[in-house]
């Protein structure tokens, strides 16, 4: 495996936020870092006055109803007396209603408590329609009724207390043996057809159309926007497209983005090392003005001193356009330049105006082309994975460019040559994900000690939380589907779905936790398993040595071009971008497997008792339910769900 590389950010995903829901009963910032809002910032609003004003308005409404219109000029003493009587009557009515309401609430609560206590003392069900049937033997009748009532009470208590929790011991020896037997028996059988194709014809109706424009170019006269994006290469890609939208929104000129160096990813690659700068500038020129660097008169400014540096602490996650118009635009007009540091997920997906959302898609799917060096090596990788295939996938020209896409096509292959298919699996099981998940994977005390030490070093906030708060147990996290799939669980999923033992499997991922020993289950059941390090020679990999971001792009290309793609963590940014790319350019012919981890976990917890046929049926049903052709849900990522009117056009 390659050295650790940024195919993901530190695992601050939607699943991670659900861990906090279990801890606090609500949402919050990821425990990887300090909370997004540590307190009032320069862009904060004081909410206390709003709450006070709301309460005052409510009280004022009641007093206004009682007192009537204070602006009425009542000079007639008769009218004044009448008004006083009406006010007194209203006050009395209000007090009576209020007291009656409190009496009713108290009576209701006391009656419920009394009924519950009486039921517990009697030991009878709350249902009143349990009547014993007439029976000539009174003794047997009493026995049957008592047994029935007792069983009913026990059923109620069990339902109330919940099912006894099943614990995970980290081993799947029984199921893995069943899987090996099933794969050996099924070597000459046909695979299920739905494995290699989209199950719904509706997918064919969606066509890419984010390249269409209906507005005039922006002159960018309000100032300059700079961004230094953090995270891995996939988080940086999202940040670039988001900052393009912000630049258009503020009528600003965008300076070519920079990428922040991280001690975790240890890659100094910049935008121009991965993406074609000239294509980026030219393709987006009808949308925004882009320059390679600041004008000379602005280069000498101390941006931090003048308050033009905006960090992720200053901007809430998924901030709405109104935030940028209210807080960032005045700063931009004042200082002529604003520099965003980090900019991870700092722009909401809804509500966003139609054309701005389309610009987001246009940037991601059209403006970001990889540099020729990466395109060429990516084409070599795909060609070998397809075993010199005689066809091109719909995504190939967009991934590696028309020039290198033709290289994938084997011109020597005859018309009867059948290209071999390959399955790409993104196995998100690096130590950072494993440690951050707080899950247990069967490694005993040694595993716990190693992961504790890793959290202390890389996730100090999370490590402190584990010491100061009661955290969800590993079993609870697994039941909720919050644990990443281990290699053993991933291979059981593939076998359960019906992938043949002969299937070529490409594994994307770096430094799988546990090393080759952990991958033993995968390689033993699927011997045709490969990685980019197996497929490419050392000479071909040499230009990318020590550049983890560029190596991650090769994984992206291999996954996006695969005949079928399986993700093991739906919150992964690489999986999200790959699946979106396949939807946008795949013409309804490139299936993606998204396991529902909560349901899959429930199946795996029965590993000691479940039969293989039942396991297969349940796994296939679980995955089949995730393959529906859905329009993008409100608030979800357009990069992952491009089937929406802003990104794609529906011809139905």
From Swiss-Prot:
Disulfide-bond pairs as recorded: none
GO CC field: endosome; Golgi apparatus; Golgi cis cisterna; membrane; trans-Golgi network
Coiled coil region boundaries: none
EC numbers for this chain: 2.4.1.-
Pathway given in the UniProt record: Glycan metabolism
Record-annotated membrane-spanning stretches: 91-111
Record InterPro entries: FucosylTrfase_pln, GDP-Fuc_O-FucTrfase, GT106_glycosyltransferase
Subcellular location: Membrane
GO molecular function: glycosyltransferase activity
Family indicated by similarity: Belongs to the glycosyltransferase GT106 family.
Stated name of the protein: O-fucosyltransferase 15
Species for this entry: Arabidopsis thaliana
Gene assigned in the entry: OFUT15
């Amino acid at each position: 495996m390659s050295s650790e590389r940024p195919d993901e950010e530190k695992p601050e995903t939607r699943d991670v936020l659900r861990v906090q829901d279990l801890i606090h009963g609500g949402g919050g910032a990821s425990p990887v870092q300090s909370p997004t809002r540590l307190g009032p910032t320069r862009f904060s609003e004081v909410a206390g006055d709003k709450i006070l004003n709301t309460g005052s308005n409510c009280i004022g409404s009641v007093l206004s109803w009682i007192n009537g219109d204070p602006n009425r000029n009542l000079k007639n003493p008769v009218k004044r007396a009448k008004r006083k009587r009406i006010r007194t009557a209203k006050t009395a009515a209000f007090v009576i209603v209020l007291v009656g309401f409190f009496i009713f609430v108290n009576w209701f609560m006391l009656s419920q408590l009394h009924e519950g206590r009486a039921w517990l003392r009697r030991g009878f069900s709350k249902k009143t329609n349990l009547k014993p049937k007439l029976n000539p033997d009174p003794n047997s009748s009493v026995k049957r009724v008592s047994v029935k009532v007792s069983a009913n009470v026990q059923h109620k208590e069990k339902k109330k207390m919940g099912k006894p929790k099943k614990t995970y011991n980290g081993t799947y020896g029984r199921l893995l043996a069943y899987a090996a037997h099933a794969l050996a028996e099924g070597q000459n059988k046909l695979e299920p057809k739905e494995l290699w194709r989209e199950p719904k014809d509706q997918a064919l109706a969606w066509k890419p159309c984010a390249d269409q424009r209906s507005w005039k170019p922006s002159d960018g006269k309000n100032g300059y926007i700079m961004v230094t994006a953090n995270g891995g290469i996939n988080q940086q890609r999202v940040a670039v497209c988001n900052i393009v939208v912000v630049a258009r929104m503020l009528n600003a000129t965008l300076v070519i983005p920079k990428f922040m160096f991280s001690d975790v990813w240890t890659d100094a690659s910049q935008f121009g090392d991965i993406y074609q700068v000239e294509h980026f500038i030219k393709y987006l020129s009808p949308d925004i003005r882009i320059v390679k660097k600041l004008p000379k008169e602005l280069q000498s400014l101390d941006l931090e001193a003048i308050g033009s540096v905006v960090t992720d602490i200053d901007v809430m996650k998924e901030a709405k356009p109104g935030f940028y118009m209210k807080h960032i635009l005045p700063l931009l007009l004042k200082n002529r330049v604003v520099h965003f540091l980090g900019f991870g997920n700092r722009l909401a997906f809804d509500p966003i105006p139609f054309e701005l959302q389309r610009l987001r898609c246009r940037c991601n799917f059209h403006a970001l082309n990889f540099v020729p060096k990466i395109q060429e090596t990516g084409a070599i990788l795909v060609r070998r994975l397809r075993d010199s295939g005689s066809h091109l996938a719909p995504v190939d020209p967009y991934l590696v460019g028309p020039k290198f896409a033709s290289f994938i096509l084997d011109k020597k292959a005859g018309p009867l040559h059948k290209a071999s298919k390959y399955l790409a699996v993104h196995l998100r099981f690096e130590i950072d994900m494993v440690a951050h998940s707080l899950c247990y994977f069967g490694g005993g005390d040694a595993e716990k000690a190693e992961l504790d030490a890793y959290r202390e070093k890389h996730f100090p906030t999370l490590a402190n939380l584990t010491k100061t708060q009661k955290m969800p147990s590993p079993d609870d996290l697994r039941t909720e589907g919050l644990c990443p799939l281990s290699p053993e669980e991933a291979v059981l999923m593939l076998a359960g779905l019906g992938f043949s033992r002969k299937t070529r499997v490409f594994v994307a991922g770096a430094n799988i936790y546990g090393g080759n020993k952990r991958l033993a289950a995968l390689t033993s059941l699927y011997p045709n398993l490969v990685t980019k390090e197996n497929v490419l020679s050392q000479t071909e990999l040499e230009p990318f040595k020590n550049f983890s971001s560029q190596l991650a792009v090769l994984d992206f290309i291999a996954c996006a071009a695969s005949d079928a793609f399986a993700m093991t963590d739906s919150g992964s940014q690489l999986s999200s971008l790959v699946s979106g790319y396949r939807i946008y350019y795949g013409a309804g012919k490139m299936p993606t497997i998204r396991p529902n981890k909560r349901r899959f976990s429930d199946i795996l917890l029965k590993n000691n008792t479940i039969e293989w046929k039942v396991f297969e049926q349940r796994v296939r049903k679980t995955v089949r339910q995730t393959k529906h052709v859905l329009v993008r849900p409100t608030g979800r990522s357009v990069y992952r769900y491009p089937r929406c009117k802003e990104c794609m056009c529906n011809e139905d």
